């Protein structure tokens, strides 16, 4: 729908929504054109600002947390003004939904582009994207702000190829509770060791995440993506820094850049300003080298949408002839409470569809996913069904399943009674497991069998901590729902 932008150029540049606009209903200020995608925090729509004709993105977020925290984070976004950070124009609070109006980046996220093209990026493309990303991080860190969710899904490109940081301070960090639920615990693959260990962290935590993102762009997915997120939580602080699967494919400069990012000690990790002087970044080419891959990705998206529409039209004809009989080419939508039918999508839902890797990365990683045909609702905004339960993070479903298993099987207790002592079962801080050589086979087998119950106990502690933080927030929401207003 880029023709809308070309035929109706902005009459003036939108910098910020004025007070008059913020007192109106959002539908009076914007015309929604289409749904762009779905993220872990809600839906994203493409819209046009009626007064200026400017294209914007609107993220509709169901608010399940402390409104005061959200307002505080939005005030932080209002302070940011950089060409390398997605601009924030204003917000509307309507019922229990937060509508966030932001800068529109027509090419989508780097993660989207990788998935659509079915290709990883070249070193030149990665260097150009990293250069813009580092400039954005340098700005945020100069403002003493931490992004906390750097990954390919949160680096957006406009149609000219300029990379911009997204989901800073608003949808990516609504509150500590939501951030830990959807970022730290739900997708730990990009998180710095000090963040996972909760020992305090500063701006260079973003640099570790940037190093992981560099590997993600090169290989299609981050390290540890093939294992359960909860296991990754314990492995990242303990194991040596990750590196490329096939180092021989990459230049010394690129590998050294990643090495500088992935230093486990925060005090010794490079800053954004220092990394902008790294040879790999200083030799980066202009954004024009990204235009071909952007055009290719947008062409693929358009062709898929056209093909999907043809399938829908064909199936509609078949359905009209068969009078509500299911077509053999259609499948029931999982979890569809309305019982409607949709065409089976041929797109992979994972973060990686490259041939050399399996599609094992969990799909709900907080990265916007491209629409399937059934998600398109004629460009209208759709309010969240209040009867629907919010999607559970994968690790909570994992908890619940394990709890059921533990009720049936008391094996964990039996094993724990036979352990030598609790100190023997702690993960060595230096990663040295030489002491295992002195253990008997029987002791080793007991240790192996006891690992899962131990992990369940540690996860239960995390869950209890989550609950203790969540309940006061829920109580506060009830009090603040009576004060619905635009801001």
Curated annotation (Swiss-Prot):
GO terms under cellular component: cytoplasm; cytosol; nuclear body; nucleus; protein-containing complex
Residue ranges constituting the Protein kinase domain according to the UniProt record: 30-281
InterPro entries xrefs: Kinase-like_dom_sf (IPR011009), Mst1_2_SARAH_domain (IPR024205), p53_tetramer_sf (IPR036674), Prot_kinase_dom (IPR000719), Protein_kinase_ATP_BS (IPR017441), SARAH_dom (IPR011524), STE20/SPS1-PAK (IPR050629)
rRNA processing among keywords: no
UniProt modified residues of type Phosphotyrosine: 433
Enzyme class of the recorded protein, top EC level: transferase
Post-translational modification: Autophosphorylated on serine and threonine residues. Phosphorylation at Thr-387 by PKB/AKT1, leads to inhibition of its: kinase activity, nuclear translocation and autophosphorylation at Thr-183. It also diminishes its cleavage by caspases and its ability to phosphorylate FOXO3. Proteolytically cleaved by caspase-3 during apoptosis at Asp-326 resulting in a 37 kDa form. Proteolytic cleavage results in kinase activation and nuclear translocation of the truncated form (MST1/N).
Coiled-coil residues: 289-311
Residues annotated to bind ATP: 36-44, 59
Modification sites for Phosphoserine: 265, 320, 410
Residue numbers of Phosphothreonine PTMs: 3, 183, 340, 367, 387
Required cofactor names: Mg(2+)
Domain SARAH: 433-480
One Pfam entry name: Mst1_SARAH
Gene disruption: observed consequences: Mice show progressive hepatomegaly with a 2-fold increase in liver mass relative to total body mass at 1 month of age and a 3-fold increase by 3 months of age.
Main location: cytoplasm
One of the protein's GO biological processes: central nervous system development
Protein EC: 2.7.11.1
The family this protein is said to belong to: Belongs to the protein kinase superfamily. STE Ser/Thr protein kinase family. STE20 subfamily.
Function noted in UniProt: Stress-activated, pro-apoptotic kinase which, following caspase-cleavage, enters the nucleus and induces chromatin condensation followed by internucleosomal DNA fragmentation. Key component of the Hippo signaling pathway which plays a pivotal role in organ size control and tumor suppression by restricting proliferation and promoting apoptosis.
Subunit structure: Homodimer; mediated via the coiled-coil region. Interacts with NORE1, which inhibits autoactivation. Interacts with and stabilizes SAV1. Interacts with RASSF1. Interacts with FOXO3. Interacts with RASSF2 (via SARAH domain). Interacts with AR, PKB/AKT1, TNNI3 and SIRT1. Interacts with MARK3 and SCRIB in the presence of DLG5. Interacts with DLG5 (via PDZ domain 3).
Name this polypeptide is given: Serine/threonine-protein kinase 4
Lineage: Eukaryota, Metazoa, Chordata, Craniata, Vertebrata
